[in-house]
A protein has these predicted regions:
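Mobile, glycine-rich extracellular loop/lid and propeptide segments
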Residues: 1-16, 21-24, 187
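Repeat-solenoid scaffold signature
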Residues: 2-13, 38-80
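Hydrophobic/aromatic beta-strand positions that recur at structurally equivalent sites within the blades
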Residues: 13-16, 109-111, 156-158, 202-206
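Blade-edge beta-strand/turn elements of extracellular beta-propeller
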Residues: 13-48, 109-127, 163-172
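Structural signature of WD-repeat beta-propellers
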Residues: 26, 101, 150, 195-197
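Repeated scaffold domains used in trafficking and secretory/extracellular systems
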Residues: 42-59, 126-136, 175-186
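Loop/turn-rich, solvent-exposed surfaces of beta-rich toroidal or solenoidal domains
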Residues: 60-174
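Blade-level signature of beta-propeller repeat domains, shared across WD40, Kelch, NHL, RCC1
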Residues: 177-207
């Protein structure tokens, strides 16, 4: 999972039995915590990062995407009125694919079984996944997300192992292509489907 720290951390927990020789990673930390590593998208000088979508996990790898929306100060910060705050957040998500607002960055972490440490494997700052929950194909070892580029909603894909091999498919600029924090799923026929502001969007397999 990712936490709510100012610079977000990716946090791993022992799922079942905690190793008998395991010690807390820091004073005051639960033994259940296996790792806690900053998500900085390759820039250790970053003073703030956000990653609010679900972490995508396959094998010993975990990928997070940036939700560091830009130029949203007028709509940020709670008013204390739930309806107004929800409307403001919705407005940010609606604009999250625009060039002035969209976040940039995808980062993969890998668990090293031998050293029992979580390490950054790769970073790609040329890809934007504004709000969709990404997915991964274990068969093809490809990462997918609903992205944005030049004001258009897109499908973005990267090599899960290296972060390279970038592929982009343009979908359109209309809100109907805005994933609005919905999940992305691969279909049995080689296509992709995701929820959007206006319903479900199906992308057939490329031939």
């Amino acid at each position: 999972v990712t936490d709510g720290a100012k610079v977000a951390n990716i946090v791993l927990f022992w799922a079942d039995r905690i190793p008998s020789d395991w010690q807390p990673i820091a004073a005051g930390k639960s033994l259940r915590v296996a790792a806690e590593v900053p998500v900085n998208f390759g820039d250790p000088r970053r003073e703030e990062t956000k990653s609010e979508q679900s972490v995508v996990v396959s094998g010993y790898g975990a990928v997070v995407v940036s939700n560091d929306y830009r130029n949203t100060s007028l709509l940020s910060g709670g008013t204390g009125v739930a309806l107004i705050d929800q409307a403001m957040n919705g407005a940010i998500v609606l604009m999250s694919g625009t060039t002035k607002v969209q976040p940039w960055g995808v980062q993969k972490f890998t668990w090293d079984k031998a050293s029992r440490q979580l390490k950054s494997a790769w970073v790609n700052t040329q890809v934007s996944c504004p709000n969709a929950i990404p997915t991964v194909s274990e068969a093809s070892q490809r990462f997918y997300c609903v992205g944005a580029y030049l004001g258009s909603w897109t499908i973005e894909s990267l090599d899960w192992r290296t972060g390279g091999g970038h592929f982009r498919k343009f979908m359109g600029m209309l809100p109907r292509y805005n994933s609005f924090y919905a999940s992305t799923q691969l279909t049995g026929d080689g296509g992709l489907i995701y929820g959007s502001f206006d319903g479900a969007v199906y992308v057939p397999a490329a031939h």
